[in-house]
Amino acid sequence: GPIWRGGDHGEAAQLASCYRSCLTLALENGCRTVAFPSISTGVYHYPLMQAAHVALKAITDFLRLHPQLSVTMVCHSPQTLHAYQVVWNMLYQETKPHED
């Protein structure tokens, strides 16, 4: 994933491309399920809420075209889970994310 440099250096496009590329490779290799962490939000310092927005939008847009694939977001902290829940609710108020 991209290193955060203030948001004016194409980071969002790079992050979305990262998710799409992984999903495309998964399909090409016959995978049915993919699990993602919150890419670039650790040592690359991508702001969590912005990263969640990019990730969820890129993934859901991809899944609309390829519904045979299943994606799980792995949230390693309560803060990450909260960010993804908030962004999910902002983007898709009519549906709920699946929690295990």
Report the location of each language-model feature.
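Phosphate/ribose-phosphate-bearing ligand recognition and processing surfaces
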Residues: I3-D100
